[in-house]
Amino acid sequence: MARDYYEILGVARDADKEEIKQAYRRLARKYHPDVNKEPGAEERFKEINRAYEVLSEPETRARYDRFGPEGVSGAGVGFQDMSDMGGFADIFESIFSGFAGGGMGGPTQQRRRGGPARGDDLRLDLKLDFREAVFGGEKEIRISHLETCETCSGSGAKPGTRPRTCSTCSGSGQVRRVTRTPFGSFTQVSTCPTCNGTGMVIEDKCDTCDGKGTNQVTKKLKITIPAGVDNGTRLRIKDEGDAGQRGGPPGDLYVYLFVNEDEEFQRDGINVISEIKVSYLQAILGCRLEVNTVDGPVELIIPAGTQPNTVMKLENRGVPRLGNPVSRGDHLLTVLIDIPTKVIPEERELLEKLAKIKGDRTGKGGLEGFLGNLFK
């Protein structure tokens, strides 16, 4: 028993025309044979098309609602009616305008049968060291992509010959079969089996590319990494994707950047973050220290009385702003105070004198206060 057309599209029986169209778009995209290679997808796609043919037209829908499948048996929308219904032609153009993608990249522009087709975009993931991401620079990468065959100039035909127009479809890439019924004519359009939709037939294939018009080539490229890139930054390398078909333009290469962690530095936006350890005496008395930055060693002044976890700022020592490298973030250093667990006798004696001067109470458990742990 044939499935209910409303059930096939997943809509209610009182669904309006727009709801039916949206359901068809969603299902056609999911089950189109060029996208879904699972067993049964093609039959499901035909089933979806048939349901939409009937339910998208008020006349055939009314007959279906009244008489069921028998009322529309063999009926359909003729090819000449597509411009009036505003359905299949527009829907297929919008649904599949992004298909024909693939490779490492995402979708590319729509391929037109028999005409030039843009090559696929490609994706490459590239890891950078922390400082490479901060300052940028030139980087050499290796890619593998399709290039137009130099022997046949992309035609796929042996030099001295040329592809001929397909006699089966007259170069359209499609074949149509018209079925006439008491309810009207039904036109079924499918890909030409002779030329596989290209509209051309190659009788003498190029020996270099075996008729494909392209060859897989591995090559090295030098690319420029801008200063200030971060995880997920995407660089577009124009025309370094796969070669186009039948004279179409090549796709692009998209390089996605990922930054390795650094042992010393971290990053928060355009600020660099690190830690610095000082002794308790340096924290109390203050000092000058040499600290590491992404630019190299610089002098940092630790003020007297610096407290644990104080954040010191080195202005303009951070990451250049992407697209405006003159503007830079800051380097933020968290001060960690190193308090020893044991001290030598001479140091202990001096600290006990200091504790008495400060009025800190001493005892068996050690000093209470800032220096307490030193006397355990």
From Swiss-Prot:
Keywords from the named record: Chaperone, Cytoplasm, DNA replication, Metal-binding, Repeat, Stress response, Zinc, Zinc-finger
Q: What is this protein called?
A: Chaperone protein DnaJ
InterPro entries reported for this sequence: DnaJ (IPR012724), DnaJ_C (IPR002939), DnaJ_domain (IPR001623), HSP40/DnaJ_pept-bd (IPR008971), HSP_DnaJ_Cys-rich_dom (IPR001305), HSP_DnaJ_Cys-rich_dom_sf (IPR036410), J_dom_sf (IPR036869)
Residues of the region (Disordered) are 102-121
Residues forming the J domain are 4-68
Q: Cellular component GO terms, alphabetically?
A: cytoplasm
Q: Which gene encodes it?
A: dnaJ
**Superkingdom of origin:** Bacteria
In which organism is this protein found?
Answer: Nostoc sp. (strain PCC 7120 / SAG 25.82 / UTEX 2576)
Assembly: Homodimer.
Annotated CR-type zinc fingers sit at 136-218
| CXXCXGXG motif repeat locations | 149-156, 166-173, 192-199, 206-213
Which residues are listed for Zn(2+) 1 binding in this entry? 149, 152, 206, 209
Task: List locations, semicolon-separated.
Answer: Cytoplasm
Entry cofactors: Zn(2+)
Q: Which CDD domains match?
A: DnaJ (cd06257), DnaJ_C (cd10747), DnaJ_zf (cd10719)
GO molecular function, one example? Answer: unfolded protein binding
The UniProt record gives the binding positions of Zn(2+) 2 as 166, 169, 192, 195
Functional note: Participates actively in the response to hyperosmotic and heat shock by preventing the aggregation of stress-denatured proteins and by disaggregating proteins, also in an autonomous, DnaK-independent fashion. Unfolded proteins bind initially to DnaJ; upon interaction with the DnaJ-bound protein, DnaK hydrolyzes its bound ATP, resulting in the formation of a stable complex. GrpE releases ADP from DnaK; ATP binding to DnaK triggers the release of the substrate protein, thus completing the reaction cycle.
Family to which this protein belongs: Belongs to the DnaJ family.
Q: How is the cofactor bound?
A: Binds 2 Zn(2+) ions per monomer.
GO biological process terms held by the UniProt record: chaperone cofactor-dependent protein refolding; DNA replication; protein refolding; response to heat
